[in-house]
């Protein structure tokens, strides 16, 4: 039977326990459904979920976004197909896996203010990756 990806998002003001709830929920899903694939996404610039799950990414989504933007500005990447290929390649490098859990972090954008660009990129990444997972926890 086909199971559509279930997406869970924990949101709220700072300090209300989003990271703790997300980590506990990911662990419960992992233990309850060991045959299912789980994508845990840390959308908090503080990167607390990586510590809670003990999964350290070597590359974050913002690192990828910045690298691709720099390549465009330098003229290294110009074609849409090159951009898509480069983004997918780096995206695979940014996912950390342990047991049935895959982990992805948004990172900490260097620019002050709005997180709009990296959040828009995160949305696209989750849309792209979610078909490979049974559960996505953000």
What are these regions (language model features)?
Residues 1-5:
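Phosphate-binding P-loop
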Residues 8-45:
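Walker A/P-loop phosphate-binding motif and the immediately C-terminal alpha-helix
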Residues 15-18, 51, 110:
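Short, flexible micro-motifs
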Residues 24-25, 53-57, 118-120:
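Short, glycine/charged-enriched secondary-structure capping and boundary segments
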Residues 30, 54, 126-130:
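Signal for well-folded cores of large energy- and translation-related assemblies
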Residues 31-97:
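N-terminal phosphate/diphosphate-binding loop that engages ATP/GTP or pyrophosphate donors
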Residues 80-138:
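Phosphate-binding/switch loop-helix module in NTP-utilizing enzymes
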């Amino acid at each position: 039977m086909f199971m559509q990806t279930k997406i869970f998002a924990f949101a709220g003001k700072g300090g209300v326990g989003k990271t703790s709830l997300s980590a506990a929920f990911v662990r419960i899903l992992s233990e309850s459904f060991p045959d299912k694939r789980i994508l845990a996404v840390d959308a908090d610039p503080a990167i607390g979920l990586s510590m809670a799950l003990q999964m350290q990414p070597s590359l974050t989504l913002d690192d990828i976004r910045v690298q691709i933007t720099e390549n465009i500005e330098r003229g290294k990447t110009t074609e849409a197909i090159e951009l898509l290929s480069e983004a997918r390649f780096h995206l695979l490098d940014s996912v950390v896996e342990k047991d049935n859990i895959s982990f992805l972090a948004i990172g900490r954008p260097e620019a002050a203010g709005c997180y709009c660009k990296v959040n828009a990129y995160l949305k696209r990444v989750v849309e792209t990756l979610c078909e490979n997972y049974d559960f996505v926890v953000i």
